[in-house]
């Protein structure tokens, strides 16, 4: 028996990192929103690493925050240790990573959902989805039928989830949760193309069973940089991590039992993440390496569980115990939660458009691992965009479309919907051709005005943003106007920085353009420096040092956006365009790009094909 459970503007299926951002964005935009979770205790769960951010991922977190999302704020509230990665490289790849208290993170996120106006939470498994005119009908296992105008699918690894540990395999979700067993069939009946991916996670072990005596200690960075641009106070480092290594004995235990790995025994059909291989995969693929690094990380302030970063596995439990105990510091380790692999259903993202809406199913959106990506941060970014666009569609407002020249979020989405995926997609700085412009320190400059226009940045935060921008502009002007005389004091500073002294007056901006010189170096002579926050000076220094490169990237962006403005008709049949190669015709008909710029990024479409397309488009527009 079924019953009418009510009408909502937007429904979000899944309350992980994608679902949370989707539901909050939708509700905060004024839409009556319902979010479903199989288990209310799984809201905001971090079933893999107890951390937020990392290379390129930290960029995504700051971008979500700049738009008005929640991940950055909550990560700051739950930080145990913070580190800025890649400081030895240029500012384009500096990325923030925080070790978090995973249980606190889940509690805080759940409470934020509970307190959010316009948002209703439901513990229920959605087993059926069907179209009803302009609405969507969602049916739960208990027979509740929800009528919704838009739906966001954020199912994570729950959809058709299957656990693998050695020869043992069973239907299951992450962290011992129930899987969503019937929704995938309903989506297939609807006509959604699904595929199988897989991921894995390491064991959690008992802190008191680890010998930390000879392990390398990894401390957090000082001063701490928060994820959120709205943070009043930065988080504090309250924990450390440890580093250890595998060895020949570890390798031998794994090789002796590799036939028992479901991955190598042919039990797993799903494709795993290329950039996060299991330890047995590392041993097999990189057999020439004598050892592999692992990080021993705390899971929280009120738990004794420790996470073994870099050691995911699907080998049998007794084999896991054996190879973990070959590692320095883990000789007597006790496993609290064993490592496992999980296989799950996800969609082919080539079915989506730039709003993350399914092209052939108006009002249906995908987000996170359901779209073929991996990672909490990638999920949150997509969840925000999908949830915001679902609400904007209901409200009859213009959609939120972020391009790859303006954000890593735009790069992520463009890669998914244009290039597709053959394995779980992971964000990396190398995926952006505009990474010097898309730095994490300027995410607010790029995206907070968009969040304000959406209605997700309130007056208080907007005033704070404008103040920061005014301070940066004032400091840029001061740097150009301030001239230092060639004094002994100045030249002593320059010599200490291993750069040439000066014989004539020199502008502050010119000194900061030198690679060897920083604001900190110039403190003794820059006596008129205003009392601005540290990030103002860091931002100005980066802008000055990389001015030439940034100008060139801005020129590239202008050209890309010129091509993005050349829209392609939705009804176009590329097979009928004379001059296009067969491969280009097939790829263009499959991806259905919205503009010439996107068409040029499709694998298999050459510059010559784009020239043909531009000629055809010009003639087509003239005929009109």
What kind of region is each of these model predictions?
Residues 4-18:
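Beta1/beta-strand and adjacent pyrophosphate-binding region of the FAD-binding site
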Residues 7, 24-132, 142, 150, ...:
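Conserved N-terminal/central alpha/beta ligand/cofactor-binding core
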Residues 18, 41, 594:
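Conserved Rossmann-like nucleotide-cofactor binding loop
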Residues 39-41, 84, 184-321, 418-491, ...:
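An anion/pyrophosphate-binding glycine-rich loop and adjacent beta-alpha core
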Residues 307-373, 401-414, 533-587, 592:
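A glycine-rich dinucleotide-binding beta-alpha-beta segment and adjacent secondary-structure elements
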Residues 369-377, 433-435:
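Glycine-rich phosphate/pyrophosphate-binding beta-alpha loops
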Residues 379-400:
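Internal hydrophobic alpha-helix adjacent to the cofactor/substrate pocket in enzyme cavities
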Residues 431, 437-439, 443, 448-453, ...:
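Extended, charge-enriched "interface" segments that sit outside catalytic cores
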């Amino acid at each position: 028996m079924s019953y009418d459970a009510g009408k909502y503007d937007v429904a979000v299926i899944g309350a992980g990192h994608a679902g949370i951002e989707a539901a909050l964005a939708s509700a905060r935009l004024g839409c009556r929103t319902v979010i479903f979770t199989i288990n209310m205790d799984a809201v905001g769960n971090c079933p893999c690493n107890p951390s937020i951010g990392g290379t390129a991922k930290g960029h995504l977190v700051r971008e979500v925050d700049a738009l008005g999302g929640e991940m950055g704020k909550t990560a700051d509230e739950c930080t145990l240790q913070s580190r800025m990665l890649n400081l030895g490289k240029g500012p384009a790849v500096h990325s923030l990573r925080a070790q978090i208290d995973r249980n606190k993170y889940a509690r805080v996120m759940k409470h934020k959902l509970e307190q959010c106006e316009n948002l209703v939470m439901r513990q229920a498994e959605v087993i059926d989805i069907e179209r009803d005119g302009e609405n969507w009908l969602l049916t739960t296992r208990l027979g509740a039928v929800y009528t919704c105008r838009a739906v966001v699918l954020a199912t994570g690894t729950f959809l058709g989830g299957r656990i693998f540990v050695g020869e043992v395999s069973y239907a299951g979700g992450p962290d011992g949760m129930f899987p969503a067993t019937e929704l995938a069939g309903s989506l297939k009946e609807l006509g959604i193309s699904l595929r199988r991916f897989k991921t894995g996670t390491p064991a959690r072990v008992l802190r008191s069973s680890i010998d930390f005596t000879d392990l390398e200690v990894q401390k957090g960075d000082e001063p701490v940089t928060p994820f959120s641009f709205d943070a009043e106070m930065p988080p504090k480092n309250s924990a450390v991590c440890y580093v250890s290594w595998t060895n020949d004995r570890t390798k031998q235990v794994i090789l002796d039992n590799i036939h028992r790995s479901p991955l190598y025994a042919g039990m797993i059909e799903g494709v795993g993440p290329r950039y996060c291989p299991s330890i047995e995969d590392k041993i097999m693929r990189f057999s020439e390496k004598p050892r592999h690094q692992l990080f021993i990380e705390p899971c929280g302030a009120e738990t004794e569980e420790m996470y073994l970063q870099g050691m995911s596995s699907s080998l049998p439990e007794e084999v896991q115990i054996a190879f973990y105990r070959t590692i320095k510091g883990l000789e007597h380790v006790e496993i609290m939660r064993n490592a496992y692999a999980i296989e799950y259903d996800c969609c082919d993202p080539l079915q989506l458009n730039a709003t993350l809406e399914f092209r052939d199913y108006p009002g249906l959106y995908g987000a996170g691992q359901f779209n073929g990506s991996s990672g909490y941060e990638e999920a949150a970014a997509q969840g925000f965009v999908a949830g915001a666009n679902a609400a904007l569609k209901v409200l009859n407002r213009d959609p939120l479309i972020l391009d790859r020249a303006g954000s890593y979020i735009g790069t992520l989405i463009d890669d998914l919907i244009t290039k597709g995926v053959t394995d779980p997609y992971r964000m990396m700085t190398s995926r952006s051709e505009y990474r010097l412009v898309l730095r994490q320190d300027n995410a607010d400059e790029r995206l907070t005005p968009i969040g304000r226009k959406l209605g997700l940045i309130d007056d208080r935060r907007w005033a704070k943003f404008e103040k920061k921008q005014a301070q940066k502009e004032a400091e840029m002007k001061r740097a150009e106007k301030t001239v230092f005389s060639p004094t002994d004091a100045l030249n002593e500073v320059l010599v200490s920085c291993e750069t040439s002294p000066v014989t004539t007056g020199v502008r502050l901006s010119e000194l900061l353009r030198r690679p060897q010189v920083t604001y900190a170096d110039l403190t003794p002579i820059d006596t008129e420096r205003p009392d601005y926050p540290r990030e103002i000076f860091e931002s100005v220094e980066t802008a000055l040092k990389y001015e030439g490169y940034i100008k060139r990237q801005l020129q590239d962006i202008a050209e890309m956006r010129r091509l993005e403005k050349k829209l392609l008709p939705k009804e176009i049949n590329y097979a009928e365009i004379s001059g296009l190669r067969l491969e280009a015709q097939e790829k263009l008909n499959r991806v259905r790009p919205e503009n010439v710029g996107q068409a040029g990024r499709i694998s298999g479409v050459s510059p010559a094909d784009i020239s043909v397309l531009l000629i055809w488009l010009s003639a087509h527009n003239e005929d009109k």
